[in-house]
Curated annotation (Swiss-Prot):
It is found in: Cytoplasm; Cytoplasm, Cytoskeleton; Cytoplasm, Cytoskeleton, Cilium basal body. Component of the CPLANE (ciliogenesis and planar polarity effectors) complex, composed of INTU, FUZ and WDPCP. Interacts with CPLANE1 and CPLANE2. This is Protein fuzzy homolog. The lineage of its organism: Eukaryota, Metazoa, Chordata, Craniata, Vertebrata. It comes from Rattus norvegicus. Probable planar cell polarity effector involved in cilium biogenesis. Proposed to function as core component of the CPLANE (ciliogenesis and planar polarity effectors) complex involved in the recruitment of peripheral IFT-A proteins to basal bodies. May regulate protein and membrane transport to the cilium. May regulate the morphogenesis of hair follicles which depends on functional primary cilia. Binds phosphatidylinositol 3-phosphate with highest affinity, followed by phosphatidylinositol 4-phosphate and phosphatidylinositol 5-phosphate. One of its GO terms (molecular function) is phosphatidylinositol binding. Belongs to the fuzzy family.
Amino acid sequence: MGDDGPGSTVHLLCLAASSGVPLFCRSSSGGAPSRQQLPFSVIGSLNGVHMFGQNLDVQLNSARTEDTTVVWKNFHDSITLIALSSEEGTSELKLERMLHMVFGAMVLIVGLEELTNIRNVERLKKELRASYCLIDSFLGNSELIGDLTQCVDCVIPPEGSVMQETLSGFAEATGTAFVSLLVSGRVVAATDGWWRLGMPEAVLLPWLVGSLPPQAARDYPVYLPHGSPTVPHRLLTLTLLRGLELCLLCGPRPPLGELDPQLLERWWQPLLEPLRACLPLGPRALPDGFPLHSDILGLLLLHLELRRCLFTVEPSKDKEPSPEQRRRLLRNFYTLVATTHFPPEPGPAEKQEDTVHPAQTPRACYLVLGPGMGWQLVAVQLGLRLLLLMLSPQTPTHGLRSLATHTLQALTPLL
C-alpha cells in the first residue's frame, strides 16, 4: 500500500463546466497546504480531455501515469472537479470520495443555486474563498476519517448517558431538535434530530466546526447539501471548554443572544468534570482505561447502518510507526478493504441473512506490510460492523482473526 512521502502532492482543480474557467486551485504537499499551482496549460489540458470525451459520449472518470493518479467528476453539468495525487498507490475511490466531499463543502457554504446557475464567475470565486479552510482539510493529513468512510467521526464519553440526557434537555429548552456536542470535530453526543441528518452534511458540519478558528460563539449560515441545498440554515456554536463545542442547527430562532451564559451554566455547570474528561477523547476516541490488547497500534470501527465510526491511533503511541503513519496506513487499508474485500454497505441479501442467522462467523482479511516493517493490518466484519486493526509485528499471524473478533465484540456495545 502506498504511503505519503514528504514529496507527495495533491492538487484539486475546480472549473465551471460550460466555460472551463478555473474557479480555484488548492494544493497540499506532504499533507500540508501548499501554494504550488499547476500551470494554466496543464489545467486546460486536463479539462479539455474530459470535455473531448463528453462530446463523444465517453465518460472519463480516472487515469494513471507513472507517478500520478487523476480523477474527474462533474456535478450538475455545472461544476467540474479534478483531483491529482502523486501518492504511491493512491486509489480512485479515495480521490472520488474526496471530490464528493469538496462539492458538498461548496454547497454547504454558498448553496446549490449559486453553483448550478453561475451568473457572475468573479463573484462566485470570492464567495468560494470561505470554503477554502474546509476544503484544504480534505487534502491534508487529517486526524478524522469521515471524508473517506462517509461515516460520522465519533468518540465515546465516560458518562455518555448523563451527557445525552443533558443534551436532550438543553435542546428542548432552546427549541431546536438538532443539537450536538463536539470535541475536535468529533461527535460526543447528539439529539435524534441531529443523527437523522443526511449525508454529506452529517459528516461536513462537525468537520466544518473543527476546521474553523476557535471562537466563544458563532452564528454561521450553512446550506445542507442533502436536506436543504437552496435555503440556508443557521449553525450556532457555543464553546463550553476549549476544544469542546455545542452546535445547534436552527432557523431564524433562537437568536444567539438568547443563549446567554446563565442558560449554559444551568445545564452544563453540573457536568463540568465529565466535560473535562471529554477533552482527551479527540485523538483517543475511547474512554481512558478501556481494555485493548497491547499489540493494537490503531483501530477503525464502522457501523455501516448508523453511518458512524470510531478512529484512533492512540493505543501504544510510544511505539513505531508514528501516529501520522498509522493514520495513513489505516486509511489506505480501508480503501483496499472497501474496494476489494467488503462491499461499502450490506446489501438486502446480507441484511436478510443477519435476521435469519444472528450468530454469524466474521468475514476477515489481513495484510502484513514488509519487508522490514512487519506491521499487520486485519479487517473483520460481523453483521453491520466492520473493524480494522493495525497490530505490532510480534502479533502471531494465526492469532489475528481471534484478536480482531474479540476486540470487535468488546467494542460492539459502544457503537
